[in-house]
Amino acid sequence: MAVNLTEKTADQLLNIDGIQLFTARAGIKQTDRADLTLMVLSGGNTVGAVFTTNRFCAAPVHIAKSHLFDEDGVRAIIINTGNANAGTGAQGRIDAIETCAATAEQTGCKPSQVLPFSTGVILEPLSVGKIVAALPKMQPADWADAARAIMTTDTVPKSASREGSVGEKHTVRATGIAKGSGMIHPNMATMLSFIATDAKVSQPVLQLMTQEIADETFNTITVDGDTSTNDSFVIIATGKNSQSEIDNIADPRYKQLKDLLGSLALELAQAIVRDGEGATKFITVRVENAKTRDEARQVAYAVAHSPLVKTAFFASDPNLGRLLAAIGYAGIADLDADILEMYLDDVLVAENGGRAASYTEEQGQAVMAKDEITVRIKLHRGQAAATVYTCDLSHDYVSINADYRS
């Protein structure tokens, strides 16, 4: 059950000039819905992308990395669900290359101008023949169709749009989709996300922007602490807006566009947590007054990853010693527990090394009963801060993953 997350309809999502969408039923795992998505770019565009840090990364990740900087630019993106094409060795790479070749033939570009993406079950060979057979049958689609077609264990399609000023006289549009529900962990996870904007941005600048946005959004979420083999985040700048190219990070428009796309990416990232497998609560962990942002993140992740903390939230049980224990084992060697403060929403829970004198069990129970909760931790060591988003851990998480291949 997703936490305060609903599907967006096609009329709520902005069309982006310079990109065409198509979907088809390839029948890779399921036969009752579209599982193949094609994005065709009209040319003159640039693409930035970041990929999983998992050393056992999937075959399409290897191929997409090698194609990203093709001298003639990316012209097509092909995405299949139902099979990750990971743990498939040399044959997996051959299958990913064949997918690119078939897509190139269908779209009129070079195979090296195609980026392939896969998501689904690991250690099973990809039915590349089904993809090749489905490509000529692709039907025009909208962003809502594409959001549904890239789903795996997701219960709600994830999409969003933004429109805002970049520069003095130009309005920029952006629309994005994402998938992900389990195996979600910082440094990218079992998630795919694609954002398209009509802004014009040079490739090196867009690549840097993509990396920075990923670090500030998708790298701040965790559902279960597992890092996937396939995760990827892509930004497409079609350049169809009439503004001049952003080719320098010193250009004031760089920050304006980054803020616009970052807001969109954060909504998509949070949607993944809201739809975390079996999730019933959306939890924000905010760590303040740390020496560095990395230190703040280290503490936030310790709390957000803890199964004991997450099950306490699921039970609406203010067993808050679990949170303090997680802070304590976060690995901050010189942390002074006697000066930190911890809050549940606005309720002071702990200070001076123990339970706050003003805190009552009834206050904690009232906050824990909510479906959206903020944990705020003040370390009183410096000025840095970081925020991480997570969800609770329920019986359904176990059931969903136990039944995943059945």
Regions found by a protein language model. Name each.
Residues C100:
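Generic structural marker for isolated residues within well-ordered, non-membrane alpha-helices
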